[in-house]
Structures are given as structure tokens and as C-alpha cells.
Amino acid sequence: MKRISLLALSLLGCLLGVGSLGAQSVDGRPSFRQGLWIGAHGGVMASRFGFTPSVRQHTHLGYLGGLQVRYDIERGASLQVEVNYQRTGWRERYDASEVSYSRDLDYLDLPILTHLYLDLGGAKVFLNAGPFVGYQLRESAQLTGKSLMGAQDKLRHELTTRYPFFWGLGGGPGISIPLGRRQRIELEGRFVYGLGNIFSTERTSAYVQSSEMRFGLTMNYLFRLR
């Protein structure tokens, strides 16, 4: 009877040992568990336009706010989808202080990003990269000193958006800090290069290029659902 009891205890010990090994990866780290995160983010976005012929500009300052969903696919890699409302545009530079012009462009954006990260024992450093698509919802302009502007400037200011769809490539680095077991806060830098134009690109058009570059800084909050 004692031998049977010892054998039963030995089998139980082996099963527990196998279970504990199943909870670890080959290198001794805890096994990876896929997770689903939801969150919100906001920040400052700056933008400039590449015009041909060129236009002297200051950096245009805008903002970004939105929601995001992140799914951890495997250790070190996730898929992230965002829905953002953001203001971009351009601000022109003139020598005369009484002359100014800026245009605001409001977009609804949908970035689809690969999220690559390195776990540093709680804190993480990461890199996001992928395509950005969006649709322009509205545009507005502010100007002073119109009578002092040249004919080319006035012509440009009369142009409205011909192509409201935005598409481009972008991403950026960031750092993620845990707030307990299910929450994280992140600081992220971002750069987006637009591949399309807002004005007509026909040969007879005033500007054959009118593409956008965006760059900025956001703060992200994420909560793990599972």
C-alpha cells in the first residue's frame, strides 16, 4: 500500500512538473499569451506641404486625437488599428509682417500599423510602421494683407482640395510604461509621408505637386481586455 501511495505521489509530481513546464517557454520565460488592448491617444501634430513650384512656409501646428485597438499576435509583434481625427495644413511665410496666410485641413484617418516591441522587464520600447489612409472632412483659411500678395499667391489661395483622400506611409518609435497588470501609458513619436496630392496634377495645373508631411508626438493610454 505504501508503494502504491509513493507511486501515486510520484505521478502527481510529474504531472505538476509538466504543467509548470507548459507555462514556460524553452528559454525559461513565461509562455506568450495573446492579448487584446483598447485605448485612446492625443497629441500635437505638425505639418508642411511639398509644393512644386515651391512655397515658403512655416511649420503648421495642429492636433490629433483618436482611439486604437491592438492585438498581440506573438512575442514582440502586434497589429494596431486606429481611428483618428486630426488637423493638419500649411502656414505660409512672408517678409512683410502684415501679410499672412494659413490653411487648416481636418481629416478622419485610419492607420493600420505593425507594432514591434522589445520587452525590458515591464517597460517596452517599440516601433510602429504601416500605411495611413484618410479622408478630408473640411478646410478653412485665414489671411491678412491680401492686397499686398502677388498674383501667384492669390491664385494658390483660391484653389480648393481636388483630392480629399489621403494616403501615405509612416510610423515612429516610442516607449511604453506599465500601470499595473492591465494598463499602459505610452509616449510615441510619429512621422507620416503623404504619397498623394490635394490639388489637381494635370499639366495645365498651377501646382504639379501638393503632398503633405506630418510629424508629431502623442500620449497613449491602453487597457488590456484579455
List the predicted regions and their residue ranges.
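Predominantly the C-terminal beta-signal and adjacent terminal strand-loop region
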Residues: 82, 166, 171, 178-226
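Bacterial N-terminal signal peptides
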Residues: 8-17
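Extracellular loop and loop/strand-boundary signature of outer-membrane beta-barrel proteins
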Residues: 50-55, 95-101, 155-161, 202-207
